[in-house]
Amino acid sequence: MSYKKLYQLTAIFSLPLTILLVSLSSLRIVGEGNSYVDVFLSFIIFLGFIELIHGIRKILVWSGWKNGS
């Protein structure tokens, strides 16, 4: 898997993982009764997933993983 593919997977899977985690933690993104805290927490989780995957990519590149061109 190339660096470019991993970057694309980051974009594809970050939002679904965020929605899944927020749903499992009993927060509601869609529906009645949303508070600004719920939306804020879901946004923080979303950013966390993006940073986690970016960090994994940096470690892979640092360890000598090639771009796969």
From Swiss-Prot:
Main location: membrane
Keyword Membrane attributed: yes
Location relative to the cell: Cell membrane
Membrane topology per record: Multi-pass membrane protein
Ranges in the topological domain labelled Cytoplasmic: 1-6, 62-69
Keyword Lipoprotein: no
Disulfide bridges in this chain: none
CC per GO annotation: plasma membrane
Main function: Protects a microcin H47-producer cell against microcin H47.
Protein name listed in UniProt: Microcin H47 immunity protein MchI
Gene: mchI
